[in-house]
Amino acid sequence: MQFSKMHGLGNDFMVVDAVTQNVFFSPELIRRLSDRHLGVGFDQLLVVEPPYDPELDFHYRIFNADGSEVSQCGNGARCFARFVRLKGLTNKRDIRVSTANGRMVLSVTEDELVRVNMGEPNFEPAQVPFRANKAEKTYIMRAAEQTILCGVVSMGNPHCVIQVDNVDTAAVETLGPVLESHERFPERANIGFMQVVRREHIRLRVYERGAGETRACGSGACAAVAVGIQQGLLAEEVRVELPGGRLDIAWKGPGHPLYMTGPAAHIYDGFIHL
């Protein structure tokens, strides 16, 4: 099987063309491939499939390193767009794809950044999903013998965003896994730790569902900005500084889609016998 290794701000992916190759990935195989000592090593596996709808260009599938399939990955979306152009699967700059729970438009700019229409953030608890009686801008949760204030949103996947004074000292390693699997998140969640530098600039670390802390989380950056705007903390255009680098997020508020712009890098191509 041929594959490419790519990364978006250090969030790394194994990307496989299932348009011209016949492939099947069991959870066991994905876990084996994701092993950084015995396999290829990656945070997520991205699979390019033929479109299910003739109006679209491709179907986009995402698997975490633990073998679970998820419906959204923002950094992966940027790598997906670069991959299909690099491999000659399309020459379009605006690429329309379906995911497990919707559609996306991936736009490759002249300087090879990728702008992704991530859709409108969804704050309805049932849609996240999150167990709550009604939608709130801020929720109170108990975890690890602490009372935690957080915002909750779906960007096509569930996110919990906590504001912290300093991301460098935030309890990502201890609070992250506890909140990820908290009983109020029936499908688990990605946990963002957000430091507001100013209205146009945040710092962020994300403990990702099924992957642990990563160098960058695109949908996590989108979620943090969406929650920050909803809570009145942030402007409509925000620079997000992650351990792996910078993303630019823009959202005009309810009724509008949120846009993420950032880089995607090709590392190498490989072949592996399965």
Curated annotation (Swiss-Prot):
<keyword id="KW-0028">Amino-acid biosynthesis</keyword>
<feature type="active site" description="Proton donor">
    <location>
        <position position="73"/>
    </location>
</feature>
<feature type="binding site">
    <location>
        <begin position="74"/>
        <end position="75"/>
    </location>
    <ligand>
        <name>substrate</name>
    </ligand>
</feature>
<feature type="binding site">
    <location>
        <position position="64"/>
    </location>
    <ligand>
        <name>substrate</name>
    </ligand>
</feature>
<keyword id="KW-0457">Lysine biosynthesis</keyword>
<keyword id="KW-0963">Cytoplasm</keyword>
<feature type="binding site">
    <location>
        <position position="44"/>
    </location>
    <ligand>
        <name>substrate</name>
    </ligand>
</feature>
<feature type="binding site">
    <location>
        <position position="11"/>
    </location>
    <ligand>
        <name>substrate</name>
    </ligand>
</feature>
<comment type="similarity">
    <text>Belongs to the diaminopimelate epimerase family.</text>
</comment>
<feature type="site" description="Could be important to modulate the pK values of the two catalytic cysteine residues">
    <location>
        <position position="208"/>
    </location>
</feature>
<dbReference type="GO" id="GO:0008837">
    <property type="term" value="F:diaminopimelate epimerase activity"/>
</dbReference>
<comment type="pathway">
    <text>Amino-acid biosynthesis; L-lysine biosynthesis via DAP pathway; DL-2,6-diaminopimelate from LL-2,6-diaminopimelate: step 1/1.</text>
</comment>
<feature type="binding site">
    <location>
        <begin position="218"/>
        <end position="219"/>
    </location>
    <ligand>
        <name>substrate</name>
    </ligand>
</feature>
<feature type="site" description="Important for dimerization">
    <location>
        <position position="268"/>
    </location>
</feature>
<protein>
    <recommendedName>
        <fullName>Diaminopimelate epimerase</fullName>
        <ecNumber>5.1.1.7</ecNumber>
    </recommendedName>
</protein>
<feature type="binding site">
    <location>
        <position position="190"/>
    </location>
    <ligand>
        <name>substrate</name>
    </ligand>
</feature>
<dbReference type="Pfam" id="PF01678">
    <property type="entry name" value="DAP_epimerase"/>
</dbReference>
<feature type="active site" description="Proton acceptor">
    <location>
        <position position="217"/>
    </location>
</feature>
<dbReference type="InterPro" id="IPR018510">
    <property type="entry name" value="DAP_epimerase_AS"/>
</dbReference>
<dbReference type="GO" id="GO:0005829">
    <property type="term" value="C:cytosol"/>
</dbReference>
<comment type="subunit">
    <text>Homodimer.</text>
</comment>
<dbReference type="InterPro" id="IPR001653">
    <property type="entry name" value="DAP_epimerase_DapF"/>
</dbReference>
<comment type="function">
    <text>Catalyzes the stereoinversion of LL-2,6-diaminopimelate (L,L-DAP) to meso-diaminopimelate (meso-DAP), a precursor of L-lysine and an essential component of the bacterial peptidoglycan.</text>
</comment>
<dbReference type="GO" id="GO:0009089">
    <property type="term" value="P:lysine biosynthetic process via diaminopimelate"/>
</dbReference>
<keyword id="KW-0413">Isomerase</keyword>
<feature type="binding site">
    <location>
        <position position="157"/>
    </location>
    <ligand>
        <name>substrate</name>
    </ligand>
</feature>
<feature type="binding site">
    <location>
        <begin position="208"/>
        <end position="209"/>
    </location>
    <ligand>
        <name>substrate</name>
    </ligand>
</feature>
<feature type="site" description="Could be important to modulate the pK values of the two catalytic cysteine residues">
    <location>
        <position position="159"/>
    </location>
</feature>
